[in-house]
Amino acid sequence: MSKEYRGRRIVLWPANIDSTLSRSEGRKIPLRDAVRKPRVEEIVEAANRLGLNPTVEEAAYPRSWWEQRKRVVVDKVGSKLNTLRMIAQEVKKLREERRRLGK
């Protein structure tokens, strides 16, 4: 993680909350809390709803450094795992709302 973020912000990769991935592939939260194939756009919207001031950055995910991907940097609220769980929960709510509205 960049020194400029240390302590105040956290770097969130979609893989960190992806229920289709194992822990060794990058998932950080329990399966029951994780989301199936989260998109960066969903994570950004969820973080906005939670007031976490998200910023999207182009970067290579350390576990697959040869692929260029996006990451989301958000304000730190409590522990990193707590923040990841909050965002995953909000993504689930977003998907449920969209499903109900037929989008």
Curated annotation (Swiss-Prot):
It is found in: Cytoplasm. Keywords: Cytoplasm, Ribonucleoprotein, RNA-binding, Signal recognition particle. GO terms for molecular function: 7S RNA binding. One of its GO terms (cellular component) is signal recognition particle. InterPro entries: Signal_recog_particle_SRP19 (IPR002778), SRP19-like_sf (IPR036521), SRP19_arc-type (IPR022938). GO terms for biological process: SRP-dependent cotranslational protein targeting to membrane, signal sequence recognition. Its main location: cytoplasm. Belongs to the SRP19 family. Part of the signal recognition particle protein translocation system, which is composed of SRP and FtsY. Archaeal SRP consists of a 7S RNA molecule of 300 nucleotides and two protein subunits: SRP54 and SRP19. HAMAP family: SRP19. This is Signal recognition particle 19 kDa protein. It comes from Hyperthermus butylicus (strain DSM 5456 / JCM 9403 / PLM1-5). The lineage of its organism: Archaea, Thermoproteota, Thermoprotei, Desulfurococcales, Pyrodictiaceae. The gene is srp19.
